[in-house]
């Protein structure tokens, strides 16, 4: 097995992964993952030692799924997650829902597939220079295409149900998790201190509101997937001389050869002033920054 991305407790803290919600807004089911309460801000602090272990476990599971050529569906429709979910899923040649989860997106896949075919039909029609339609008709077709693209664009090429979900914000995406549970599709999810961990097979305790934190988790997942693809290609006898990246058309490529590997789909340095965990388990900041905590 290839390696999953390396990270440290310091990396997690610099990304703000440890910062939870106000103590009064917590979900008691998250108690095992909470380190303490910020003495000045009254927010829960997530135990990054547990986050590190569980993140590595989740990344290992994702690696194994992709190495076996399984499909990963990134799900994150909140404003803070929408862009990075789409960017990182595309970067590693996987799939995403970042606008709105449509009920039945998994459990009624046949209907969703039909809608995807309609999207492709609209695109073909709008690109047909010989088509005889009025401007009004073309505008109507384009509006329908845009609506379908917004909802289904990230899964248009998925070709079947995903083999695993990666979710940001389990409270907001509870319907997606319920559908995955019903179909016995495993779920990897970032869980904040107010999250409901039920239905999550591979929890990752962490801040699911901060853009920095969301970006950290999405990049870790994307990099893991790219490493799994690289390893699978090499084990299949395909030379991967350069880094694995994304071509302009969205396919994953070997940048050393420029060779598309889209067929695989489906089938920093730490700053000196950053806070860190020290002896005794207390979290302190060398810079005295606002993230500093002392747990008595």
Curated annotation (Swiss-Prot):
GO terms for cellular component: cytosolic small ribosomal subunit. Belongs to the universal ribosomal protein uS2 family. Keywords: Ribonucleoprotein, Ribosomal protein. The keyword tRNA-binding does not apply. It comes from Anaplasma phagocytophilum (strain HZ). This is Small ribosomal subunit protein uS2. It comes from the Bacteria. One of its GO terms (molecular function) is structural constituent of ribosome. GO terms for biological process: translation. Residues 246-272 are annotated as: Disordered. Pfam families: Ribosomal_S2 (PF00318). InterPro entries: Ribosomal_uS2, Ribosomal_uS2_bac/mit/plastid, Ribosomal_uS2_CS, Ribosomal_uS2_flav_dom_sf. CDD domains: RPS2.
């Amino acid at each position: 097995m290839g390696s999953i991305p390396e990270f440290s407790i310091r990396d997690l803290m610099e990304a703000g992964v440890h910062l939870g919600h106000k103590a009064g807004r917590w979900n008691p089911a998250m108690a095992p993952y909470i380190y303490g309460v910020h003495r000045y801000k009254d927010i829960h602090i997530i135990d990054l030692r547990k986050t590190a272990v569980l993140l590595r476990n989740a990344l290992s599971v994702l690696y194994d799924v992709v190495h076996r050529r399984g499909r990963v569906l990134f799900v994150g429709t909140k404003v803070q997650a929408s862009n990075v979910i789409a960017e990182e899923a595309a970067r590693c040649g996987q799939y995403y829902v970042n606008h709105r989860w449509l009920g039945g997106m998994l459990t009624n896949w046949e209907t969703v597939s039909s809608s995807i075919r309609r999207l492709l039909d609209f695109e073909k029609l709008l690109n047909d220079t010989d088509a005889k339609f009025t401007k009004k008709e073309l505008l109507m077709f384009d509006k329908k295409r845009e609506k379908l693209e917004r909802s289904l664009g990230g899964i248009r090429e998925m070709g079947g149900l995903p083999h695993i979900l990666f979710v940001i914000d389990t409270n907001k995406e509870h319907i997606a998790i319920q559908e995955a549970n019903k179909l016995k599709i495993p779920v990897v999810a970032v869980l904040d201190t107010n999250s409901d961990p039920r239905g999550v097979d591979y929890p990752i305790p962490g801040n699911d509101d901060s853009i920095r934190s969301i970006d950290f988790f999405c990049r870790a997942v994307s990099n893991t997937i790219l490493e799994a693809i690289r390893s699978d290609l090499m084990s299949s006898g395909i030379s991967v001389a350069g880094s694995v990246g994304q071509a302009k058309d969205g396919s994953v490529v070997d940048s050393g050869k420029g060779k598309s590997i889209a067929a695989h789909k489906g089938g920093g340095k730490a700053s000196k002033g950053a806070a860190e965990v020290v002896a005794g388990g207390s979290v302190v900041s060398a810079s005295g920054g606002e993230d500093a905590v002392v747990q008595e």
